[in-house]
Every structure is written in C-alpha cells, then in structure tokens.
Amino acid sequence: MEDIIMRVRHSKLLALIGAGILAVTTLVACGNSNATTAQPSAVESSAAESTVAESSAAAPAETTTDLSGSISMVGSTSMEKLANALSEAFMEEYPDVTVTAEFVGSGAGIEAVTNGTADIGNSSRSLKDEEKAAGVVENVVAIDGIAVCVDPANEVADLTKEQLTNIYNGTVTNWKEVGGADEPIIVIGREAGSGTRGAFEELVDLVDGCKYANELDSTGAVIAKVASTPGAIGYASLDALDDSVKALSLEGVEATAENIKAGNYFLSRPFVMATKGEISEQNDLVQAWFDFVLGDEGQQVASEVGLITVK
C-alpha cells in the first residue's frame, strides 16, 4: 500500500516537472519568434538592399535640360537671316521655347534691350561708348565679311577705301585712275533691299549713294556677271567667291576669314546680340540661347548663312 502511494506521488512530480519544461520552452520559442520578426536575417537584408539598388539604377535620371518660355529679340535688319536661322534651330532643339524677333534697325534694338522691352538687341555695328555706359554688353556672335571682286584679267590687285568709295559713287570711272589698264569700270551691285548691298554701302559710307551699271538679285548673279564682263567690279559674301573672279585686297589686306576675325580687313562688321548686363547675369533661358549660338551648332548655322564664325 505504501509502495503504491509513493509511485503515485512520483508520477505527479514527473507530470509537474514536464509541464514546467513545456512552459519554459513555449516562452523561449515566443521570445525567439519576436526577435526574428524585428530583425531579418543577413541574407534577407542583403537581398532587400540589392533590390532597392537595382530599382534605383533602373529608374531614369531626371532631365535638367528641358527649357520652356520665350526669348524676344529686336534690332538689325541685316541680321534677319541669321536671327531666323538660329531661332529655327534653337526651337527645334527646345520645342517648348518660343523665340520672337523684330527687325527694325540696330539703334532700335539697342534701345529695346536698354529699357528692358527685349531680352536681346541685335546690332550690325559695334556698340557706342554711351550704350556701353548704360550697361549694355556687346556679344559678338558672327562677323559679316564682304569681298570686292573683279574679272581675273584685271591688273589691279589692291584698292584703298577712298578709291573703292570713289569707284562706287561714280567719281572714278576708268581703271587707269587707280593703277590699272585704260578700261572703263563697270560697277556691279545687288538689288535694293539686299542685306549684302546694305552692308557694303554702309561700310563705304555710301548708303543709297552708289552708281550702279547693273543691279542683280543674287550673289551668284553678281559673281557670274563680274567674271564675264571685262572691267567689271562687284561685291559678294566672302564665302561665296570662286575661281571665276579675283578678290581684291583692301588697304593692303587680303580678304580672308583670318584677317576678318583679326579686324584687319575693313569691309567687315560684327553681328552683335547685345544684353543688359553680362550673359551670366541673364535668366537661364537666355543663357541657354547664348550657349547654343556660340557653340558648335550655332556657329555652324552662322557659317551656313554666309557669315564668319567667332569660335
């Protein structure tokens, strides 16, 4: 009887011990479960970081080159061809930008940029001291060079500015008066309204004062007429000349792009896009315009319209 009681008590004790072990095991398991939830394994963390990195790499970078808004230019009629060509190319690259231009003369352009009614003032001359004193900055974007040509058989190789002016105003009418053969001078020029004619007449101080034997409507026509006419003299954009005519030196300086860039050839003028203050002080859109105009693409446009580049 006593032995039975002892076995019962021993069984109860084992049951209690088993229950206690089970409880402790459960608590530990719960504790481990919480820890696992709070801190993922190193493998899981690495995989997550890799996924984030891949997502970041796959996402496209935000562009910073998008431009929008408008640029206004006012000024030189002689710069119309250049301004329009540059505007077209710039707006093609930046479709959300509008470039407007009014061609009302250099003086009006400088006035507009001075009083703030235009972003850019186009001028086909250098700025005057008083204009610079008002804070206007001269930004030369191209150079207009004009060559004087004669037929290849002409003995004359050089003219002074005075001689050239006197030939075109009708004072000098024979080549022997300027060191050539005894041959009448046939004065060839462009039609009224031509930008080349306007530039030439302005540079020799003969606006509307030239006495032409022939007025032709294209550069090619002028060159062809001079080449085929003994005693003829004409003018054309430097880049348009070919071997069918002979270019004259002026004041002892040959008509070359290098001499024009150096300012040694007088029959040339700057094409200026003036700003009120330095380019770096303008808004982002205007700064982008000058980056384009003075960059490779803009200078290529200038060359294509017959101008001397500045870069």
Where are these regions (language model features)?
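Bacterial Sec-dependent N-terminal signal peptides
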Residues: M1-I17
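Exported/periplasmic ABC-transporter solute-binding proteins
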Residues: V8, G31-Q39, E44, E49-K311
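C-terminal motif of bacterial Sec signal peptides marking the signal peptidase cleavage site
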Residues: T25-A29
